[in-house]
């Protein structure tokens, strides 16, 4: 746009399509013998003599010697069933998918309006906002207008773009802004509270949890991320 005076390019910056990532992870887990349950929820998590068991809404009981809780903002209620306090608040973020001729081919963070634009296949994702309105997926039209207006300042062509999809997600945010990563109880680990950095911090989080589960040393600074 004409009001843009400059930009900073990070040569080592990378982006990922979360939907593709989930598909690849699902296939990898299945290939390693992992079981994936969909269309049901965890109603109860409780201890038993050999570890942990989760009672599903389908009636199935899933038993495990060791448990890793990574349920995003819903980790708080599940951790409470286990006797662990993990205080979090859902922070709603909006995502609008559009079809735009001549769309950017690299991801960009528009600092002033705090909006991110990311190519996703043939579409462009415009995402942003941080709305504290509890556990709901209501879409506020004013938030959507603010989101698109912020992007239009930098990309005027968005004004005539074809809208394809609109949705929102709940980010798990802690009071300190730090994620909660580590052993919560004997045989149980927790990894949650990453806010807007979930995908970015996922590999490092996975390594911390895996090293701790295998008895490998973890950095001293990881102590401040431990569940309390």
Task: Name each model feature, range by range.
Residues 37, 68, 189-191:
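Hydrophobic/aromatic beta-strand patches that form the interior of the parallel beta-sheet core
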């Amino acid at each position: 746009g004409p009001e843009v005076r400059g930009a900073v390019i990070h040569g080592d910056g990378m982006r990922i399509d979360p939907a593709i990532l989930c598909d690849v992870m699902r296939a990898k887990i299945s290939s390693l013998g992992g079981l994936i349950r969909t269309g049901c929820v965890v109603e109860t998590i409780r201890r038993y003599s050999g570890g942990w068991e989760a009672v599903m809404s389908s009636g199935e009981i899933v038993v495990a010697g060791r448990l890793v809780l990574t349920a995003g903002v819903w980790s708080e209620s599940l951790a409470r069933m286990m006797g662990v306090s993990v205080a979090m608040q859902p922070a709603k973020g909006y995502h609008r998918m559009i079809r735009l001729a001549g769309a950017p081919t690299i991801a960009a963070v528009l600092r002033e309006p705090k909006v991110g634009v990311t190519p996703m296949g043939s579409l462009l994702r415009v995402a942003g906002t941080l709305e504290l309105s509890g556990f709901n997926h209501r879409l506020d039209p004013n938030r959507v207008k603010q989101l698109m207006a912020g992007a239009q300042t930098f990309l005027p062509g968005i004004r005539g773009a074809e809208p394809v999809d609109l949705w929102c997600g709940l980010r798990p945010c802690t009071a300190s802004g730090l994620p909660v990563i580590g052993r919560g109880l004997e045989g149980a680990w927790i990894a949650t509270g990453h806010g807007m950095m979930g995908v970015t911090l996922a590999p490092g989080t996975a390594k911390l949890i895996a090293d701790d589960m295998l008895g490998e040393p973890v950095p001293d600074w990881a102590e401040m991320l431990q569940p309390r």
